[in-house]
């Protein structure tokens, strides 16, 4: 019996190791791929800006029009698909259960892909635009998002599921903003789409933040989440109001 118990304990120890190795086997290629994306943006960004006329659209010193179009598949398709696949892999138990699983084991290719993808996607703009050409509000937005992402994915990992869903909500608003900035010809439809989509996006993000806060034990952690969500949603909504007022 002791030998069987020892064998079971040994197998129990080996299973997390095997899971970790599996995740590394997924995470390493993803990391290399994301680095290659940054390198590609660094090499192709300036020529693309030159060919397409550089920064265009409603916002001065915003992303180039080609960058806005390029972002849409990731914002509207890839991130939601990653969430759905990861959620189904856990038996569709809900965002809270996903967060608890992530806090315990830090495993799952869909989760790791999101963890790596989101900050890399934001870093692209630093390579494409450069610090000197970025709007201050855009720079503040990107830095805040990257810092918040690291905090939500690791120190406060129990809220990972709700955080992931909140990012999808925010990226939906950024997606309709990109459609507006892309300059599609059917104005004022895109203006109304931007204003309505951003409002819905911010409300959904606040809903997710409310549930995320319930997973955080420390008061300081809750305060960080409330402040970051509040600042981001207010900034985004103000920009949407300004664009709506100017364009209608």
What positions do the PLM features span?
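Membrane-helix and juxtamembrane interface regions of eukaryotic multi-pass membrane proteins
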Residues: 3-6, 10-169, 180-248
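Solvent-exposed interhelical
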Residues: 175
